[in-house]
Amino acid sequence: MGKNVVVLGTQWGDEGKGKVVDLLTESAATVVRFQGGHNAGHTLVIDGEKTVLHLIPSGVLRADKTCVIGNGVVLSPEALMDEIRELEAKGVPVRERLRLSPACPLILPYHVRLDQAREKARGIAKIGTTGRGIGPAYEDKVARRGLRLGDMLHRERFASKLGEVLDYHNFVLTQYHHEAPVDFQRVLDEAMEIAEELRPMVCDTVSLVHDTRKAGENILFEGAQGSLLDIDHGTYPYVTSSNTTAGGTATGSGVGPLYLDYVLGITKAYTTRVGSGPFPTELFDEFGRHLAEKGHEFGATTGRARRCGWFDAVALRHAVQINSVSGLCLTKLDVLDGLENIRVCIGYRSKDGETIDTPVDSEGYEVIEPLYQDLPGWSESTLGVKRIEDLPNNARAYISFLEEQTGVPIDIISTGPDRNETIVLRNPFLD
């Protein structure tokens, strides 16, 4: 019988999921995206060539792999076609490998306009969204007024629904935000043109996933963003609009939770965050600048500089709990090379000296300070190391300490951006 493995981020996103998914896809028949939208940015480096994916599962670069965009993904038809064409220009036969759920909620131009208008109105209190319409599209889904990919395949149905929802959103845009309205005919014409290109890729993805499982094939479920951005369990309201945790796998793909065999949590050897929101271990000194520069910490989707800080074991323990993480993959270990001392946050303390657990909302983070334990660094390079025995002693001690703090084994260690620069202690599909 095949295995179903979930790969997701356990921090605030940007943990290096794309590389790990690409690596593990060698052992999978199918790769499934189950939430998020084109606000994600998964960077792959294969033989020195860099590819950034936003919607299409990272397994697309491997031959004979089926890639599925499940019903939990909010889909921008325009962004998807741009990504397909970009990959095809590199010689990747995307259309024969990609399958799309007809239940995907659509991101249309008015969602983007609303997203950007809201962020503008918030001023300094902005959430820090990518401005790509993700939140408004999920809102329409929950409000039961959203258009779905299946609607695009039927012109009259799509036009009727579009007219109704556009009246509503144009009222908000013009009367509340004082912005120009979105043109109905332009949205309709653009959608219908793309619909014919997407039609051959649309299918019953729930049955496809279950048929793959019944055939004894391995399936990899690829998460986007990170667990601490989860709409329910993250640092609310500085979160994304979907469930980025393991529970979202079932609702976003149609696979039952009892069929999930292993959850691999991806975490950097330090911590980063893009945009606004709590970040207890954030650094504003030369160490923070070192991590940002050596780690090339700029968002793959927005290009925004990432905030950097020490490893937060408290936050990771929380992520382990809410995901039932089976094992961890530690990425960007090489960024810590050359540091004399490395700090790990092992607890939170309130201003009155009380040790506390993870706050449930962003306000709770305003009254805590991190408790650190200092560990010795290493001067040797870990870049490209492929065996655990070849790592510096202090690097191995650091890895062991993180395992002790989180209570979860570190099964994979990434020592560089290329898929080959990896130490695999346990392959979720094979061991």
UniProtKB/Swiss-Prot annotation:
<keyword id="KW-0460">Magnesium</keyword>
<dbReference type="GO" id="GO:0005737">
    <property type="term" value="C:cytoplasm"/>
</dbReference>
<dbReference type="GO" id="GO:0004019">
    <property type="term" value="F:adenylosuccinate synthase activity"/>
</dbReference>
<dbReference type="GO" id="GO:0000287">
    <property type="term" value="F:magnesium ion binding"/>
</dbReference>
<feature type="binding site">
    <location>
        <position position="306"/>
    </location>
    <ligand>
        <name>GTP</name>
    </ligand>
</feature>
<comment type="subunit">
    <text>Homodimer.</text>
</comment>
<keyword id="KW-0963">Cytoplasm</keyword>
<dbReference type="InterPro" id="IPR042110">
    <property type="entry name" value="Adenylosuccinate_synth_dom2"/>
</dbReference>
<feature type="binding site">
    <location>
        <begin position="332"/>
        <end position="334"/>
    </location>
    <ligand>
        <name>GTP</name>
    </ligand>
</feature>
<feature type="binding site" description="in other chain">
    <location>
        <position position="304"/>
    </location>
    <ligand>
        <name>IMP</name>
    </ligand>
</feature>
<dbReference type="GO" id="GO:0005525">
    <property type="term" value="F:GTP binding"/>
</dbReference>
<feature type="binding site">
    <location>
        <begin position="300"/>
        <end position="306"/>
    </location>
    <ligand>
        <name>substrate</name>
    </ligand>
</feature>
<dbReference type="InterPro" id="IPR042109">
    <property type="entry name" value="Adenylosuccinate_synth_dom1"/>
</dbReference>
<feature type="binding site" description="in other chain">
    <location>
        <begin position="39"/>
        <end position="42"/>
    </location>
    <ligand>
        <name>IMP</name>
    </ligand>
</feature>
<dbReference type="InterPro" id="IPR042111">
    <property type="entry name" value="Adenylosuccinate_synth_dom3"/>
</dbReference>
<feature type="binding site">
    <location>
        <begin position="13"/>
        <end position="19"/>
    </location>
    <ligand>
        <name>GTP</name>
    </ligand>
</feature>
<keyword id="KW-0547">Nucleotide-binding</keyword>
<dbReference type="Pfam" id="PF00709">
    <property type="entry name" value="Adenylsucc_synt"/>
</dbReference>
<dbReference type="GO" id="GO:0044208">
    <property type="term" value="P:'de novo' AMP biosynthetic process"/>
</dbReference>
<protein>
    <recommendedName>
        <fullName>Adenylosuccinate synthetase</fullName>
        <ecNumber>6.3.4.4</ecNumber>
    </recommendedName>
</protein>
<feature type="binding site" description="in other chain">
    <location>
        <position position="225"/>
    </location>
    <ligand>
        <name>IMP</name>
    </ligand>
</feature>
<feature type="binding site">
    <location>
        <begin position="414"/>
        <end position="416"/>
    </location>
    <ligand>
        <name>GTP</name>
    </ligand>
</feature>
<dbReference type="GO" id="GO:0046040">
    <property type="term" value="P:IMP metabolic process"/>
</dbReference>
<feature type="binding site">
    <location>
        <position position="41"/>
    </location>
    <ligand>
        <name>Mg(2+)</name>
    </ligand>
</feature>
<feature type="binding site" description="in other chain">
    <location>
        <begin position="14"/>
        <end position="17"/>
    </location>
    <ligand>
        <name>IMP</name>
    </ligand>
</feature>
<feature type="binding site" description="in other chain">
    <location>
        <position position="240"/>
    </location>
    <ligand>
        <name>IMP</name>
    </ligand>
</feature>
<dbReference type="InterPro" id="IPR033128">
    <property type="entry name" value="Adenylosuccin_syn_Lys_AS"/>
</dbReference>
<keyword id="KW-0436">Ligase</keyword>
<comment type="similarity">
    <text>Belongs to the adenylosuccinate synthetase family.</text>
</comment>
<keyword id="KW-0479">Metal-binding</keyword>
<feature type="binding site">
    <location>
        <position position="14"/>
    </location>
    <ligand>
        <name>Mg(2+)</name>
    </ligand>
</feature>
<feature type="active site" description="Proton acceptor">
    <location>
        <position position="14"/>
    </location>
</feature>
<feature type="active site" description="Proton donor">
    <location>
        <position position="42"/>
    </location>
</feature>
<feature type="binding site">
    <location>
        <begin position="41"/>
        <end position="43"/>
    </location>
    <ligand>
        <name>GTP</name>
    </ligand>
</feature>
<comment type="function">
    <text>Plays an important role in the de novo pathway of purine nucleotide biosynthesis. Catalyzes the first committed step in the biosynthesis of AMP from IMP.</text>
</comment>
<dbReference type="InterPro" id="IPR001114">
    <property type="entry name" value="Adenylosuccinate_synthetase"/>
</dbReference>
<dbReference type="InterPro" id="IPR018220">
    <property type="entry name" value="Adenylosuccin_syn_GTP-bd"/>
</dbReference>
<keyword id="KW-0658">Purine biosynthesis</keyword>
<feature type="binding site" description="in other chain">
    <location>
        <position position="130"/>
    </location>
    <ligand>
        <name>IMP</name>
    </ligand>
</feature>
<feature type="binding site">
    <location>
        <position position="144"/>
    </location>
    <ligand>
        <name>IMP</name>
    </ligand>
</feature>
<dbReference type="InterPro" id="IPR027417">
    <property type="entry name" value="P-loop_NTPase"/>
</dbReference>
<keyword id="KW-0342">GTP-binding</keyword>
